Amino acid sequence: MDGDTVDVDIDLGFGMWMKKQRIRFYGIDTPESRTRDLEEKKYGLAAKAFVEASLPVGSTRTLTTVKDKTGKYGRILGKFKAFDSYTDAWVNLNQWMIIKHLGVEYHGQSKELIAEQHIINRGLVDLDAL
């Protein structure tokens, strides 16, 4: 798991489950948490920690998948809803992470095209406030 990919068990209803499914957050890219670039790693680990706090192990969340689409590595693409205690409302976690500068919008374009936005985000995200 990292800031834009999680492993989940999906309840399909009627006692049917899809276990240990890897879900790629749709429409977002976060900095890598497994990299030799220590600056990028710091922000990647912050995004990962934010996701772990928003989707704790054993919790139940709403996942909306993107119909008939998978990511580059065959992962299911999805959007999560998580509860934001500050606004006392359920929010689209994917968009919330972009708003908090933990990730950038991503729809399959090359990583080079979004690298600059990741660097800009480093100056905008408040790691202490997470």
Where is each model-derived feature located?
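Small beta-barrel nucleic-acid-binding modules, primarily SNase/OB-fold domains
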Residues: 1-130
